[in-house]
Each structure stands twice: as structure tokens, then as C-alpha cells.
């Protein structure tokens, strides 16, 4: 509600005022606190627009309870940051160039140790596997499981690494761990790996599978929240059957993307700099703008240094 938002905003504005004071006492420009809020507001706007494009639910509310107010024009934000200007000395350090140099080569997004998402594919160097998800699906990499699900979030397939007894065949493992009768049982043999898949009847029914890779076992569970399993079962099976060891040429894909600095040349466009990014070109351009404080419609000037992800 607006009442709760207002209460929360008072607390956040107090924190912003303190942040501005800390900046001033450390020798930095205290008004940079407003720039920080602007960046966070832009991030929220971008996330909303991205959700709307993908047919996902758009989160209500606004950062700091700002509603539709832009941080640069927000009177109360200016008021809490203003007093910190009295604490600022004459040497208000910015140090943007030094900061940017420290960013060169920094990993961006997924890490090699946790696995890397690239488009509809997932790569894990240490565990030596890859698998693919249907077009339009999201991939969520959690510490305990890897999840894939469509835009409507009404179904999902999860995969996790589980302990297993090497004396059990994949079929025996699945029967032992399913805890009930299996249906539509089928052996899996893919890329030199052995596995087994079946359906666990019930409400809801579940597609389950296990794949052995060396001394590791990967358990898959696919569920449709509302409706029959058949509506997504072919897609669940496509994910399961895509699991395989990495090829040599794919090992580079299992390494994280990194930030790099590029200097804009005369005539060079954001579209050119964003080419080859994830998703559509328009999405890549929007992300590039967001990364460089140009969102939603800013353009770089020749000679500007921009952060790009490669």
C-alpha cells in the first residue's frame, strides 16, 4: 500500500542521507548518492520492461517508493542529500578512470565454479557436462539444483547431483528412490552415458530420470503445476536427452563472460558494440545502455570509454 511504501521510503531516504555524509567525509562528491539511486531506478525500469516483453508478471511498486518520480527531480531525496554538501572539502575525488581500469577483465554474471548459462545452454567445466533447454525457457542456477521453466512458470524441470550406490543400475536407482510404481520406463544411452527415465504416476504426475557420469549421478524431475504432464513431457525429455559431456571446443563456453573496456570511435554505434550479445539486438543494446549509465535512450560520444561484456 501507499502507506507502507511511504514508511519504507522514509527509512531509505535516511540511509541515503547517511550515505551522502559518508561520501563527503571520505572526500567524494556527496551528490553521487543521487546518481546511485538513479542507477537503481534504471535497473528496476529495465527489469520491468524486460518482464513485459517476455510475457512475465511485472512487479508492482518502485524503488524507494519513487513511483514515477525521477531521482534527479525528487525533492525529498535532494533535501536529505543536501546537508552533506557542507561536509565536503574542496577536493572531491571521482577517480572514474582508475575505477574503470580495475574493472577490466572482471568476471560478469555466472562463474565457472557454479556453471555458465549461454542462451538456452548450460555449461559446467569442473563437472564436465552441458545440457540445453527449449527456446524461450529460463534457466535458474541455484546452489542445490539447476531449474528450467517456460515464461508462464507453470512447469519446470529440475536437475541435481545426488549420491548413488555404484552397485545399482540406473533403473534400480530410480525404482529405489521414486518410492512407488513407475510407468513408461525407458533406458537412456547418450554420448557414452547410461541412464534411465520413467513417469511417476500421481497428481501431479512427474517425469523422472537419472544419468550416471563416472562416480556421479544426476537426478531429473519434471512437473506441470496445473494440467497434464503430457503438455510438457516432450520438452522435459529433450532436456534430459541433451545432457552429455563437454566437447573440447565447448570448454571455453564454460568460462565466465568478462567486462572489457572499449573506446567509442567516430561513427560507432551501440548496435555495433552490442552485436553478438545474449538475446535480441534490442535487448543487448538496452543492457549495454544500463551497464554504462545511458539507459534508457542515451548515446555515447566518440572518445567515451564503455564497459562491454565478452
Protein language model regions, located:
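A Zn2+-metalloprotease active-site environment signal
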Residues: 1-95, 100-104, 108-133, 138, ...
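Signature of long, low-cysteine stretches enriched in small and polar/charged residues
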Residues: 158, 174-223
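Extracellular LysM carbohydrate-binding repeats and other cell-envelope/extracellular binding modules
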Residues: 282-310
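Surface-exposed amphipathic alpha-helical segments
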Residues: 87, 220-256
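Primarily a LysM-type cell-wall glycan-binding module
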Residues: 248-279, 304
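Short, surface-exposed polybasic-and-hydrophobic patches located at secondary-structure transitions
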Residues: 150-161, 257-266, 306-309
Amino acid at each position: 500500500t501507499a502507506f507502507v511504501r511511504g514508511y519504507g521510503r522514509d527509512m531509505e531516504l535516511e540511509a541515503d542521507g547517511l550515505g551522502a555524509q559518508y561520501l563527503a567525509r571520505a572526500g567524494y562528491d556527496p551528490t553521487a548518492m543521487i546518481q546511485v539511486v538513479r542507477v537503481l531506478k534504471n535497473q528496476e525500469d529495465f527489469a520491468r520492461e524486460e518482464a513485459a516483453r517476455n510475457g512475465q508478471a511485472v512487479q508492482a511498486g518502485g524503488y524507494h517508493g519513487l513511483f514515477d518520480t525521477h531521482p534527479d527531480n525528487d525533492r525529498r531525496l535532494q533535501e536529505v542529500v543536501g546537508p552533506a554538501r557542507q561536509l565536503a572539502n574542496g577536493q572531491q575525488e571521482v577517480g572514474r578512470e582508475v575505477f574503470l581500469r580495475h574493472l577490466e577483465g572482471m568476471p560478469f554474471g555466472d562463474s565457472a565454479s557454479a556453471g555458465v548459462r549461454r542462451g538456452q545452454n548450460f555449461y559446467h567445466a569442473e563437472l564436465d557436462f552441458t545440457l540445453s533447454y527449449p527456446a524461450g525457457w529460463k534457466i535458474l542456477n541455484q546452489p542445490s539444483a539447476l531449474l528450467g521453466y517456460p515464461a508462464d512458470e507453470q512447469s519446470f524441470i529440475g536437475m541435481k547431483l545426488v549420491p548413488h550406490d555404484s552397485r545399482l543400475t540406473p533403473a534400480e536407482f530410480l525404482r529405489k528412490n521414486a518410492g512407488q510404481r513407475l510407468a513408461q520406463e525407458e533406458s537412456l544411452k547418450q554420448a557414452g552415458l547410461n541412464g534411465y527415465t520413467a513417469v511417476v504416476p500421481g497428481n501431479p504426475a512427474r517425469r523422472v530420470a537419472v544419468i550416471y557420469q563416472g562416480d556421479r549421478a544426476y537426478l531429473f524431475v519434471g512437473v506441470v503445476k496445473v494440467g497434464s504432464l503430457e503438455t510438457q513431457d516432450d520438452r522435459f525429455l529433450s532436456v534430459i536427452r541433451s545432457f552429455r559431456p563437454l566437447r573440447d571446443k565447448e570448454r571455453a563456453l564454460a568460462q565466465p563472460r568478462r567486462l572489457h573496456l572499449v573506446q567509442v570511435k567516430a561513427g560507432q554505434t551501440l548496435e555495433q558494440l552490442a552485436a553478438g550479445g545474449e538475446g535480441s539486438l534490442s535487448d543487448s543494446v538496452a543492457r549495454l545502455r544500463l551497464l554504462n549509465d545511458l539507459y534508457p535512450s542515451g548515446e555515447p560520444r566518440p572518445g567515451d570509454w564503455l564497459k562491454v561484456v565478452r
